[in-house]
Regions:
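Amphipathic alpha-helical segments within well-ordered protein domains
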Residues: 19, 23, 90-91
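Extended, small-residue-rich solenoid/repeat segments and analogous flexible loops
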Residues: 55, 59, 69-76, 80-135
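Left-handed beta-helix
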Residues: 113, 118-119, 124-125, 130-139, ...
Length: 217
């Protein structure tokens, strides 16, 4: 009973502090903002699902790296895992329309790891970033399950003159399942779709789609 009580106290404390921080991003709210409380409640209820995703990411990072001797090593020392951990939480807040906080979280991870994952990106299960430095994943990127990115991989947007930001238009690539993108490769544009089971070799530059089961060298 004591353990259960402690867990409930921790949960309530997180709920209270998160509600307060969300309220600070909403100028129209007072200290007892019901909208902020509802968002915080929805986030707390999603924690088990976030944990499940992170455990799958941890497995992908451990099983995908022969140099890793334990999951504890990956969790405590791998920059890719750290960036993914923060992304999963920030993305949940982003999906709940929380302003500013998700981006602050992603920029903190960026400053600590050199990995820039926008919280708006949609990333599937078993996500693995190897080495990590210089990886960029843009806001409207869609990534499937079991995808591995190596250092310097960029999933970015094209920047034609006068292009305006439109949240309803995908500006970044879509990547299928079981894809490997090797070091310093760049994939750009919302029309770029990478099929399942594709390998993108190092230093590639793609602005067009790739059929499934293809090796790009």
């Amino acid at each position: 009973l004591g353990l259960v009580g402690s867990e409930m106290c921790i949960r309530d404390s997180i709920h209270e502090k998160l509600t307060r921080q969300i309220t600070l991003t909403m100028p129209e709210c007072d200290e007892n903002c019901e909208v902020a409380y509802a968002i915080s409640t929805a986030f707390i209820e999603r924690i088990p699902a976030i944990q499940e995703l992170l455990l799958k990411d941890l497995s992908a990072n451990f099983e995908g790296d022969p140099a890793a001797y334990s999951k504890e090593e990956v969790l405590l020392s791998y920059p890719g895992m750290f960036a993914i951990f923060i992304y999963r939480i920030a993305h949940e807040l982003y999906e709940n329309k929380v302003a500013m906080i998700p981006r602050m979280m992603s920029e903190y991870a960026h400053s600590q790891t050199g990995i820039d994952i926008n919280p708006g990106a949609k990333i599937g299960e078993y996500f693995f970033i190897d080495h990590g430095t210089g990886v960029v994943v843009g806001e409207t990127t869609i990534i499937g399950d079991n995808v591995k990115l190596y250092q310097g991989a960029t999933l970015g947007a094209l920047s034609p003159a006068g292009m305006a930001t439109n949240p309803n238009v995908r500006r970044h690539p879509k990547v299928g399942n079981n894809v490997v993108i090797y070091a310093n490769s760049t994939l750009r544009g919302g029309a770029t779709e990478i099929g399942d089971n594709v390998i993108v070799g190092g230093n590639a530059f793609l602005t067009s789609s790739v059929e499934p089961d293809t090796i790009v060298s």
